[in-house]
Amino acid sequence: MTTSKIGVRHAGHGHTVNIKYGYIIFGVSVLYALLLASAHFLELRQWRRQKRPSRSSVWARINNAPFWVHTLLWAAIVVGLAFTNVHDLSQNWTVVVKRLGRLAFCLVPLDLALALRPCLLGQSYLELMPLHKWLSRLIILAGVVHGIGFFVKWTIHHQLGKAKRWANLAGIIVALFSVLLVIVSSRPVRRRFYSYFYAFHNFTVALFVLLMIWHARPGVSDFVLLSVALLLFQGASRVYNGYSVPGLTIVDADAASLRLLRLQKPNSFPSVWQPGSHIRVGLPLSSWQSWVFPAHLYTLCSSPANDTLNLVVKKGRRFEMLTSLEYRVSCPYASLPTPWLSTAENVHIVCGGSGISLGIPLYEYFDNKSSVLANLHWCVSNARDTFVLSELGVNNPVNVYVTSGKIDQSSYDDADNEDAGLLGAGDNIELEPIPAENKSNPFTDDHAVNCAEQRIQMHAGRPNLSEILASFSETDDNAHKLLIVCGPVGLIRDVRAYGDAHGIAVFSELYNM
């Protein structure tokens, strides 16, 4: 009688050894999410108790660490786990290749959680969006290396026919769509075709999650179910936290580049929200387009006491709202960290173009507090845009700087058009000084009278930050000074540089004018 030795499937190739590393990185991601949520909560609690921000506390350092620090941390974790306990790499390199695929997919739940709206970690999801984007790229990179590694393995062993098997083909499909996603997510493509990028992004995510049911071996059904649950939560949240708009009024002015949209407030809309909050506006759920293309982010330029939800938008946007169509809005999302509303004593707000929609509600809130010194500075390329101040009933003093001339695109370049209401559609605000020969009053007499009645101080040319922010010197403690900037990237860069140079906290939001 002859005996034969039964070999173990994929003997020596770590077929099951990588399972635990998937659970390890998932456990690390859970701890990481808890750390982010805890750091955010504890920093704000400490801030409220001390009535001043503490930039040196460990919680503040974690909560305010640049996104690239988090990205490098996760890259180090993935690489470290990929090579842990792998001896004689020349013989066991396929273990690393297999492990990278599992590590990539087990990070998907964290990546989805970072993009949830509203965010479950306490922060504004806008704060976590850069981390979501770069973690997605890290996942794709690990997945692509995983795929290339298998092609190399099959080529060496003359087994390219394995690529035709459905389980492997599913992985190839995911890899191809992931590479395409990286291409369409590049800045030029994303800015120009954001709605299509958004649809392709969501399709690729769904494809990635579902095809892993067949591709991953051993299976990852638990991670698939968790990922599907997060996607369903996002869909349910969109339904539950949305409100149908009864009607829309468009307020326009001749020769102005901005317009005012007045949305009738839905009956069930929240009765309280923080000044400077955002809403998303899209088509009703009955429209298939609302499920395929993105809703658009706008800043609420109104208070809870108003009967309408007021939005200041740039004319000629890709997303044009019409009175003949129905719309749906989300619940308000806060932007400015809440403790600033009670601890700031000297506030300057610098806006560019439609960034005034964030500036007005915050300015009115701070200016109506007797203990706060508040100033609003607004840069516009068209003096006629100031009509929105009278339409919104702004009676507080406002400094308006009317600029002209083309600007250097490399200096004031548009940023990504990822939220077409808040982040604009590709036209810059002009911030260059008016040439000396043109510095006569650029306003008509009627316009000058209206501005005087509204306590608006009109200035020609780009503002000098050192001059307009000089009143910061009236407050000794920098911990109670706040500089808010909302506008294009160039304006934000200059204001941030001023804040850093003078030790003043800066809160910024990007608006492409």
Swiss-Prot record:
Q: What is its main location?
A: membrane
What is the enzyme's class at the highest EC level? oxidoreductase
Keyword Transmembrane belongs to the record: yes
As for family, the record states: Belongs to the ferric reductase (FRE) family. AIM14 subfamily.
Q: What does this protein do?
A: Probable cell surface metalloreductase. May be involved in iron or copper homeostasis.
Give GO cellular component annotations, separated by semicolons. Answer: plasma membrane
Q: Where is the Ferric oxidoreductase domain?
A: 100-211
Q: Kindly provide the name given to this protein in its UniProt entry.
A: Probable metalloreductase AIM14
TM helices/strands, residue ranges = 22-42, 66-86, 103-123, 138-158, 166-186, 193-213, 219-239
Q: Which residues form the signal peptide?
A: none
- Protein source organism: Clavispora lusitaniae (strain ATCC 42720) (Yeast)
